Regions:
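Structure-specific DNA junction-binding interface
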Residues: 1-98
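Short acidic alpha-helix initiation/capping motifs at coil-to-helix transition points
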Residues: 56-62, 126-130, 192
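Helix-hairpin-helix/helix-loop-helix acidic hairpins
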Residues: 73-80, 84-141
Length: 223
């Protein structure tokens, strides 16, 4: 383990004095979601996910999004997953919802999301990340790394296999704990983050999936 990764490990041990969070706790991480805000911002004429009209769920958990991400075969499936992922990522804050809904106005967004889902399940995380950056073949205008890494994570984490790294979410809170700038991450930075997370997992909670590390980095928020 290099010195910078060891510094991050020390931060996590301070933030979690009782030990690393359990994988079940991570999967149970949930947020209330602002259905009415999403209804107002969903593009007219676009396929409308049933969740917008359902009154059943008042919160969305990681587990819920992972389950929906297991099978995405059509553009409609991709839009349903995007809504669930973005609802989990924004909660009830109107400004955050407005930002997350903006990419849906882009032409061909559903087709690109479907392609990105497939890429996340078959390619190395950093390669998929590079394709979703500005200038990449899977670039969606107004969809930045803090959100498209959520897409890569939910699409590809459970599809990880031996020899291929598992994708993780990288946002400002995670970056702050890493001691990084809170924006402008390159594909090589994302690859470095994935490698650091694996090293941190091996040193701190070797039996856990690496999203336990991402959750801990997010929760610590630079502490």
């Amino acid at each position: 383990m290099d010195a910078s990764t060891r510094v991050v490990l020390d931060k996590l041990k301070v933030a979690f004095p009782q030990g690393p969070p359990a994988a079940e706790q991570v999967r149970g991480q949930e947020f209330a979601w602002g259905r009415s805000q999403w209804e107002k911002r969903w593009p007219a004429g676009m396929y409308r996910p049933a969740a917008l009209d359902s009154q059943e769920a008042v919160a969305v958990s990681r587990r819920d999004v992972h389950r929906r991400a297991e099978r995405v075969d059509t553009e409609a499936d991709a839009l349903e997953l995007y809504l669930l992922m973005a609802a989990w990522g924004t909660g009830t804050k109107a400004r955050a919802i407005a930002r997350a809904a903006r990419p849906l106005q882009e032409e061909g967004v559903a087709a690109t999301l479907l392609q990105a889902h497939s890429a996340a399940r078959s390619e190395e995380p950093a390669d998929c990340y590079a394709q979703m950056l500005r200038g990449g073949s899977l670039r969606i205008k107004h969809l930045g790394p803090a959100f498209f890494t959520k897409w890569i994570y939910f699409a590809g984490f459970e599809a990880g296999s031996s020899g291929r790294a598992r994708p993780l979410i990288l946002d400002a809170r995670v970056a702050r704990t890493l001691g990084w700038a809170t924006w402008g991450w390159s594909a090589s930075s994302y690859a470095r983050y994935i490698a650091m997370s694996e090293a941190l997992r091996d040193a701190w909670c070797p039996e856990a999936p690496t999203d336990v590390i991402e959750y801990a980095l997010f929760t610590a928020n630079g502490a």
